[in-house]
Amino acid sequence: MKDVKALKLMTLNDVLSQINGDMTLGIGTGSTMELLLPQMAQLIKERGYNITGVCTSNKIAFLAKELGIKICEINDVDHIDLAIDGADEVDPSLNIIKGGGGALFREKVIDEMASRFVVVVDETKMVQYLGETFKLPVEVDKFNWYHILRKIESYADIKVERRVNEDVAFITDNGNYILDCKLPKGIDPYKFHEYLIHLTGVFETGYFLDMADQVIVGTQEGVKILEK
């Protein structure tokens, strides 16, 4: 049986086939992209592609630079041709939860900007409903984070925790906190997103709804390509 890393690597050829000679590329954050990015950089170099990357986190920007990928800031481009990113959960409608790496705000900005958004996952990320195996991240202001937490818990039977890293509050690249929400089955993601996004102090949610153009899934039986 193949492990998760092997399942992700199975998707490599399908990911690389999306990249062509002259494009602005949105580069996602997380373990999947860290695994695939060196191969993407090698392809760009070998074929002499004129690729400019727009990165979703400081960490992935540092890695891309080390690999020789030309990068720029989001405000230096007026379009993104293709965004490639991982996901924490994907439901049967190809709706997604992201934000396990804490970069959900920048990821959503870049993925929404892209003409095409391709998601790469292994089969363990496929779920029947969003929140089945992964908590929903919500990026919030430090000032009133606890009051936001209480309001989220009052919405339904939702357990909310402020994310910590080695006993210290996790801080996003934007200087905010992350609240991780354990969702019960039956939560409507569209309605819950609307509730959250209208709370003062909420910057963004980890719901990526109706955004993915294609999901590439590494499975024990091979690679599956899912599209709406």
Curated annotation (Swiss-Prot):
Q: Which GO terms describe its cellular component?
A: cytosol
> Where, by residue number, is the active site?
107
Coiled-coil parts of chain: none
Catalytic reaction annotation: aldehydo-D-ribose 5-phosphate = D-ribulose 5-phosphate
What does the entry give for GO biological process? D-ribose metabolic process; pentose-phosphate shunt, non-oxidative branch
Work out whether the entry's keyword set contains Secreted: no
The pathway entry for this protein reads as:
Carbohydrate degradation; pentose phosphate pathway; D-ribose 5-phosphate from D-ribulose 5-phosphate (non-oxidative stage): step 1/1
Keyword set, alphabetical order: Isomerase
Tell me which EC number(s) this protein carries: 5.3.1.6
Q: Name one GO molecular function term.
A: ribose-5-phosphate isomerase activity
One Pfam family hit: Rib_5-P_isom_A
Tell me if Isomerase is a UniProt keyword of this record: yes
> Which residues of the sequence carry a binding annotation for substrate?
29-32, 85-88, 98-101, 125
Into which family does the record put it?
Belongs to the ribose 5-phosphate isomerase family.
Q: How does it assemble?
A: Homodimer.
Cited function:
Catalyzes the reversible conversion of ribose-5-phosphate to ribulose 5-phosphate.
Q: What is this protein called?
A: Ribose-5-phosphate isomerase A
Query: What organism does this protein naturally occur in?
Result: Staphylococcus aureus (strain MRSA252)
Q: Which gene encodes it?
A: rpiA
